[in-house]
Amino acid sequence: YLSRVFQDPKMGTAPRMTVAENLLIAKFRGERRGLFPRRLNHYKEEFQATIDKIGNGLEKHLDTAIEFLSGGQRQALSLLMATLKRPELLLLDEHTAALDPKTSVALMELTDDFVQKDRLTALMITHHMEDALKYGNRLIVMKDGQIIQDLKQEEKAQMTISDYYSLFE
């Protein structure tokens, strides 16, 4: 299946449900869910161990409704939910655009950890050239709705930020 993380931190989660409830929905994506409260209690320790690894304060909020989380915490949770069951394709649609620079860097590092650990195929849409060069292994550059450059790993490795910016001149 396809999984995605949206640009808006408010998308991709159920705001009035808790972190644990959102994770339970993600864990059983595509399956019959039934007896929700019983399953929730069964998986709480697993969910706690999972969010402990994120390290952005989310670990203190397993029983907190999503609407009370920061944008960075919501995006980290959305990413975790999107990758809890290994997707065939992870679509990242400007998923750091609404975040402050420090939170954006932390989320990109978390994204890279998930992609590398689970060997995920990810399509990241971004306007951050530095992220495209650092994390992408293939870059497709578009301008005015047209592909103007398709760079493989080897070609990308030879580029600097200045080279990349010159593609848009």
What is the meaning of each model-derived region?
Residues 82-83:
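ABC ATPase C-loop
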Residues 17-29:
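Q-loop/switch helix immediately C-terminal to the Walker
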Residues 126-127:
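H-loop/switch region of ABC-family ATPase nucleotide-binding domains
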Residues 101-103:
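Helix N-cap at the start of a conserved alpha-helix in ABC-type nucleotide-binding domains
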Residues 90-93:
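Catalytic Walker B motif of ABC-type/P-loop ATPase nucleotide-binding domains
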Residues 146-169:
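Conserved beta-strand-loop-alpha-helix hinge in the C-terminal portion
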Residues 50-67:
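Conserved ABC nucleotide-binding domain
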Residues 105-117:
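Helical segment within the ABC ATPase nucleotide-binding domain
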